[in-house]
Amino acid sequence: SVTIDYDKCKGPECAECVNACPMEVFEIQGDKVVVAKEDDCTFCMVCVDVCPTDAITVKE
């Protein structure tokens, strides 16, 4: 599963995860980054590595 802690996430002003994810799991919807295609996640952890606020949790 891929979860975003919205208390930590800076949303579209950051969007590092959106840009970094090779599977395009994340997308911007309004003022939030959302997990749009969780089933496409390959657990590569790039999103976790690039997130400056540690807002993303990935569990197989």
Swiss-Prot record:
Chloroplast as UniProt keyword: no
Function comment: Ferredoxins are iron-sulfur proteins that transfer electrons probably in the CO-dehydrogenase complex.
Residues annotated to bind [4Fe-4S] cluster 2: 21, 41, 44, 47
GO molecular function: 4 iron, 4 sulfur cluster binding; metal ion binding; oxidoreductase activity
Protein name per Swiss-Prot or TrEMBL: Ferredoxin
Xref: SUPFAM superfamilies: 4Fe-4S ferredoxins
UniProt KW keywords: 4Fe-4S, Electron transport, Iron, Iron-sulfur, Metal-binding, Repeat, Transport
Organism placement in taxonomy: Archaea, Methanobacteriati, Methanobacteriota, Methanomada group, Methanococci
Binding site for [4Fe-4S] cluster 1: 9, 14, 17, 51
Pfam family, one: Fer4_10
Ranges of residues in domain 4Fe-4S ferredoxin-type: 2-30, 31-60
InterPro entries found in the cross-reference section: 4Fe4S_Fe-S-bd, 4Fe4S_Fe_S_CS, Fe-S_Ferredoxin
Keyword check for Cytoplasm: no
PANTHER family in alphabetical order: 4FE-4S FERREDOXIN-TYPE DOMAIN-CONTAINING PROTEIN, ADENYLYLSULFATE REDUCTASE, BETA SUBUNIT
Cofactor note: Binds 2 [4Fe-4S] clusters.
Temperature dependence: Thermostable.
UniProt cofactor(s): [4Fe-4S] cluster
